[in-house]
């Protein structure tokens, strides 16, 4: 099978290219840019590609659909919206790592992304690809955001089984620097980040509406969540610590059983039998590791969800959705063990 990848210079695109190269069902990858009108050698993009013979072609929707079975967009928000319409019109398979088609409501996109949205008709063609909560997929798959993935996997059993007070959910999320993207800013500068923690986008993170959209599909009583994001001085990884009041007295064993029942058929979701996960448990893999606890003194359920933001939170989940769409083995081309030490 031949596949197309638009965007190989950002962190998610780099990881996705590596995963696609080692996928057993993929014979060839065609790379495309979205700026410029000339073909460039991949090896000129970064030193890591010096042995690569691939080239990056100018974007050409017609050529992509003619020569490939599917296209992956590893492009920034606002870019994919401008490129995707020919594929939507042709019902050509797309997996989109940007946030441009995750939200069903164009007004919500305008509010949270501060950009012009795709049309409501175009947005309606996309399905939200939370790969470990299988649902029917359309030809246009909107890959979830990294924070959204970690948070939703941590909340799904609580929401679907209505175990918590729906207005009591608090999420404290922490991410490594690669989640901020490749372009350096004052906030991501080494001097600002090293030996430091910094809260950002308090109650304003653009992944909030996609989380709410999915949570309300599971349980309409969830009207809002408190969600904070903190930048931490590590390269990769997301840890979300979730707090919610239980609807009735429980035990940790009962809470863990709810999670095990939800994920027992999902090879990439690990519910720990004891203790809490760390970033080292997942970085380099496509796994989500979950730890749970119940505090009877405060009647609070605590869930810790950890993922690699560039794998499960981006490229790995994109490949997982690719496997689902074409009915390949769910683990094909994906690492199930973390990189340790």
From Swiss-Prot:
**InterPro entries registered for this protein in UniProt:** AGPR_AS, AGPR_type-1, NAD(P)-bd_dom_sf, NAGSA_dehydrogenase, Semialdehyde_DH_NAD-bd
Q: Which PROSITE patterns would you find in this protein's record?
A: ARGC
Where is this chain primarily localised? cytoplasm
The biological process GO terms on file are: L-arginine biosynthetic process
Which residues are connected by disulfide bridges in this protein? none
Question: What Enzyme Commission number does this protein have?
Answer: 1.2.1.38
Q: Name one GO cellular component term.
A: cytoplasm
Q: Which domain of life is it from?
A: Bacteria
Q: Molecular function (GO) terms listed?
A: N-acetyl-gamma-glutamyl-phosphate reductase activity; NAD binding; NADP+ binding
Which Pfam family, just one, is annotated for this protein?
Semialdhyde_dhC_1
Pathway(s) it belongs to: Amino-acid biosynthesis; L-arginine biosynthesis; N(2)-acetyl-L-ornithine from L-glutamate: step 3/4
What compartments host this protein?
Cytoplasm
Keyword field contains Oxidoreductase: yes
Q: Which reaction does it catalyse?
A: N-acetyl-L-glutamate 5-semialdehyde + phosphate + NADP(+) = N-acetyl-L-glutamyl 5-phosphate + NADPH + H(+)
Q: Which top-level enzyme class is recorded in the Swiss-Prot or TrEMBL entry?
A: oxidoreductase
**Which residues constitute the catalytic centre?**
146
Q: What does this protein do?
A: Catalyzes the NADPH-dependent reduction of N-acetyl-5-glutamyl phosphate to yield N-acetyl-L-glutamate 5-semialdehyde.
Annotated HAMAP family = ArgC_type1 (MF_00150)
In the record, the note on similarity to other proteins reads: Belongs to the NAGSA dehydrogenase family. Type 1 subfamily.
**Protein name as catalogued:** N-acetyl-gamma-glutamyl-phosphate reductase 2
Q: Which organism is it from?
A: Lactiplantibacillus plantarum (strain ATCC BAA-793 / NCIMB 8826 / WCFS1)
Lineage runs: Bacteria, Bacillati, Bacillota, Bacilli, Lactobacillales
Gene that this polypeptide is encoded by: argC2
């Amino acid at each position: 099978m031949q596949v197309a990848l638009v965007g190989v210079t950002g962190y998610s695109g780099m990881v996705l290219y590596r995963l696609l190269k080692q996928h057993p069902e993929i014979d060839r990858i065609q790379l495309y840019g979205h700026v410029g009108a000339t073909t460039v050698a991949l090896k000129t993009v970064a030193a890591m590609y010096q042995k690569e013979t691939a080239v990056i072609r100018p974007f050409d929707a017609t050529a992509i659909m003619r020569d490939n079975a599917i296209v992956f967009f590893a492009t920034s928000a606002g870019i994919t919206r401008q490129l995707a319409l020919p594929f939507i019109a042709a019902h050509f398979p797309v997996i989109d790592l940007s946030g441009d088609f995750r939200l069903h409501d164009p007004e919500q996109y305008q509010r949270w992304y501060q950009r012009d949205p795709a049309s409501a008709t175009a947005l309606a063609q996309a399905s939200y690809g939370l790969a470990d909560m299988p649902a029917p997929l359309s030809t246009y798959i909107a890959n979830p955001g990294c924070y959204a993935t970690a948070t939703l996997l941590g909340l799904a059993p609580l929401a679907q089984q209505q175990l918590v007070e729906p207005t009591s959910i608090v999420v404290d999320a922490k991410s490594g620097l690669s989640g901020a993207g490749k372009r350096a800013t004052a906030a991501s500068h080494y001097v600002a980040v090293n030996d430091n923690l910094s809260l950002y986008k308090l109650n304003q993170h653009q992944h909030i509406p996609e989380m709410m959209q999915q949570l309300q599909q599971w349980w309409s009583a969830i009207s809002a969540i408190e969600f904070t994001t903190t930048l931490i001085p590590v390269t990769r990884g997301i840890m979300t610590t979730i707090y919610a009041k239980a609807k009735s007295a429980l035990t940790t064993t009962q809470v863990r059983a709810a999670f095990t029942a939800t994920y027992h058929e999902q090879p990439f979701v690990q519910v720990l039998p004891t203790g809490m996960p760390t970033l080292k448990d997942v970085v380099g893999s496509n796994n989500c590791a979950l730890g749970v606890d119940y505090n009877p003194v405060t009647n609070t359920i605590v869930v810790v969800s950890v993922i690699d933001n560039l794998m499960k939170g981006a490229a790995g989940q994109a490949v997982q959705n690719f496997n689902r769409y074409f009915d390949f083995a769910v683990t094909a081309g994906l690492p199930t063990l973390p990189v340790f030490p």
